[in-house]
Amino acid sequence: MLASLPQMEALHSLPRNQVVPMRQPSAEDLDAAQQLISSAQAGREHLADHYREDGMVQRSGQPGSNQWNGHNETPSEKTSPSSQKDTTFLGHSCSNCGTKSTPLWRRSPTGAMICNACGLYLKARNVARPTKRNRMQSEGAEKPPPPASSHCGGSSEGGGCKGSCPGGGSCNGTGGAEGCDGCPAYNNRIYKSATRGAAAIQSSWGRHQAHEPEPATQEETPVKAPAPADASNTLVACQNCGTTVTPLWRRDEQGHPICNACGLYYKLHGCYRPTNMKKSIIKRRKRVVPALRDQSPTAGTLSSNGSSTSPEASPAALAHGHDDHYRYMSSEPGDHYQMMPGKTEDAPRALPFAPPPVDFTGYNVSSVPLAHGPSIPHGLPKLLEVERLGHSPVSQYGRRSVSPNTLNVPKKRTLAEAATEALPAPSTLEAGSNQLPPIMSSANPTPPGRLSSISSILNQSDVRGEPRSDNNLGRPPPIHHSVSPSPHPPQPLPGLASLGDSVDRRARLEREAEQMREMLRAKERELAEMRR
């Protein structure tokens, strides 16, 4: 009774000490503490298993300890599978703390393999996890057991580390490159080889225990040892394509194992993947740049061919792709540049998102013969050439039909309004004429760089009352062309002259009507482009 009083006083004193305010731990601290506890528990279980195995080996060497060895064999067999489950891959080791067992392998910013605890610590504090806590004892205890893991490591190194994997995002599961340590297909190969090595050791150790005279061990070892050996000796192969290398094994509707590629293909398309799509190299994504990637001999060739999507090669590859894309898109406008009369051979090389390179210096020069051309066939090709010039630079952006008026975007007033404001109405027109003054005049003989507006086209329909001769399909002629027919009325035969003038006038009106229809179609195309 008196002995229990101090314990009760200690229990009553606990709430008083807990009244002291404490800082609440953050989520990162809780995760790091949980990982530390799990890693410490895994280390203690590994040490306990190691001590049990050493004690069993020592007792098995003594002649008089057969009965005690057979009695303790069952607990060791029960605890060994748990230690095998803790060690996910025997070929890995944390580059920071050196541990070989972790629930999740991570990668450091340099590409090295680290355990889950070191990865969470680095993610939370941006500092490498300190390793001088209890590592001296664990390192001293972990040095004796490598006979079991050395065989597995040797088999994995012989089968995977000296492989022919090209690296750089293309993997064939054999290893041998710089970044193969974290490849899922390579990890699967290591896991299979490690399982086979462990099963072989367990079977040999089971046969060694079977020679003991204890009957209980002879009954247990034949039942437990051959099962993992049979399961590990059979490699898993895809039911569809037959491959044995894949980053993730899946199952079809019947439960057969299939590779990741066949499973995704069936999930997306609803049918099995054709066998001719099978490839010997697996292309995987590079989320983290592996260490010393630039020193890999295959990095340059793979990045130039486009098979690798590594982050360090992405800027050059993207720039090269943009250059090729622009070169392909600008192949058609290059022909138009060579066909331009005032264009030199060196066409401007602009960025793909820059304004279209257009030379406006030869635009007015090429459009001058429209008003002063001697014949009709000379004016039509010029008009078509100007229209082709208008929509040729824009064709690389997907616009195929653009009228010539889109070249001069600023448009505030029509040419007819500008002409009426600049010059008064000429006195040479007939009294009964209701038409507007001509667009071109002697003061401004050079025509503008674009066609007239819709209002000027519609107002030109009253041109029937003007007795003038015009043989080109360009704009209405200047004043000196309209003044030229003035000396013709005082002719000896006015009837024949009027008949000839009516025929010429009819032909001229038909040509002008066709010209106005063409201009109206151009305006309609321009309006259609503006509505888009």
Curated annotation (Swiss-Prot):
Residues 59-87, 295-312, 430-444, 452-462 have a biased composition (Polar residues). Pfam families: GATA (PF00320). It is found in: Nucleus. Keywords: DNA-binding, Metal-binding, Nucleus, Repeat, Transcription, Transcription regulation, Zinc, Zinc-finger. A zinc finger (GATA-type) spans 94-118, 238-262. One of its GO terms (molecular function) is RNA polymerase II cis-regulatory region sequence-specific DNA binding. GO terms for cellular component: nucleus. Gene3D superfamilies: Erythroid Transcription Factor GATA-1, subunit A. InterPro entries: Transcription_factor_GATA, Znf_GATA, Znf_NHR/GATA. One of its GO terms (biological process) is positive regulation of transcription by RNA polymerase II. Residues 56-87, 131-153, 202-227, 291-318, 422-506 are annotated as: Disordered. It comes from the Eukaryota. This is GATA factor SREP. It comes from Penicillium chrysogenum. The lineage of its organism: Eukaryota, Fungi, Dikarya, Ascomycota, Pezizomycotina.
